Design a protein with these regions (language model features):
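N-terminal helix-loop segment corresponding to the beta1-alpha1 unit
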Residues: 1-184, 212, 267-274, 292-301
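Glycine-rich beta-alpha junction loops
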Residues: 53, 131-134, 196-201, 232, ...
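Short acidic/polar mixed-charge low-complexity motifs
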Residues: 73, 188, 233-235
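A short glycine-threonine-serine/GTX helix/turn-capping micro-motif
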Residues: 157-167, 191, 223, 234-236
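Glycine-rich phosphate/adenylate-binding loop
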Residues: 167-218
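Alpha-helical interface/anchor segments and their boundary "cap" residues
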Residues: 206-257, 261, 266-274, 282, ...
Length: 301
């Protein structure tokens, strides 16, 4: 499996609920292109317009850019020129949905604000990706600042993944499919806004209600739901349900944190994986070369 294999949903090839839906995207970087790729996987006919300088993601990660744009017709246009605008509106006339990732003033300068588009293309639905909702939509930001605002950064280290962007891409998909469905029913375009800071807040919800996070039930409060050191690496245990907890206690020689830690220390990653398969335990172990915990104190030894 390639590193980008998880980009697309693993549905049967015959599952194409968006067949016949025509989507145009002007969104650069990560959330918009990820959403576009997944809409294409569901059968939508997708196109993308990039500025003459291209999408910055191409230089940041060529492999991810290629994966996101496989099967996408990409066209370079300067939307600040009359020829570029004429070409854009020709595509919009044949589109059902437009994805953008500009701040509101930039949309207005390009003639892509809601009022202008509704007048020119009343059938067209739009999903506008912004950093923050409502009156804060013009405030700049990126994944890191959205995670910080949501309280998802608990050290000075950078996060290990772009959680707000990737979660945001799924929210964009949800909005896109909902807009298409309502527009089909009403005959009128639907205009929605997705804020990436809201997506980060959504991802933070389990922490906010006290379910996850340091010291919470799923943040180290349960001995059977934790990360331990094993003989040659690390092991993640998720024996949450009673039958899993009972199986773990039986093979570990006890249910206490000390008993589980001792059991993990005396086995290697491969041994623990084999035991997990034999006893139907939710466990994943990996050897030392991959075991580089980012936050000291999260690993039980």
């Amino acid at each position: 499996m390639t590193r980008t294999a998880q980009l697309l949903p693993h549905h049967p090839a015959t599952f194409r609920p968006l067949a016949g839906v025509r989507v145009l995207s002007l969104a650069l970087n990560l959330p918009g292109p990820v959403a576009l790729a997944r809409l294409r996987a569901l059968g939508a006919h997708v196109r993308k317009i990039e500025p003459p300088s291209g999408d910055p993601m191409r230089s940041m990660s060529a492999a991810l850019y290629r994966a996101m744009h496989r099967g996408v017709a990409v066209q370079a246009l300067d939307l600040k020129t009359e020829p570029g605008q004429a070409a854009l509106h020709e595509v919009l006339r044949a589109s059902d949905l437009l994805l953008t990732a500009f701040r509101p003033p930039a949309l207005a300068r390009l003639g892509l604000d809601r009022a202008t588009l509704s007048a020119a293309h009343p059938h067209l639905s739009t999903v506008s990706i912004v950093g923050h909702p409502g009156r804060r939509a013009n405030q700049p930001g990126h994944d890191l600042t959205y995670q910080a605002e949501a309280g998802l950064l608990d050290t000075a280290r950078l996060p290990s993944t772009l959680l707000a962007d990737m979660t945001g891409a799924l929210v964009v998909m949800e909005a896109a499919m909902g807009a298409v469905m309502q527009a089909r029913a009403s005959g009128c375009g639907v205009h929605l806004q997705v804020a990436l800071s809201d997506a980060a807040g959504f991802a933070a919800l389990p922490r906010d209600v006290g379910l996850a996070g340091a010291g919470a039930l799923l943040g180290g409060g349960l001995p059977g739901y934790a990360v331990y050191a094993c003989r040659d690496g690390l092991v993640a245990l998720a024996a949450l349900e009673p039958h899993f907890a009972e199986s773990l206690a039986r093979i570990a020689g006890g249910a206490s944190r000390a008993a589980i830690a001792r059991w993990c220390r005396t086995h290697g990653a491969a041994q623990l994986e084999a035991l997990a398969a034999e006893h139907d335990l939710p466990l994943r172990a990996w050897p030392l070369e991959r075991a580089k915990p980012r936050r000291p104190g999260q690993v039980n030894t």
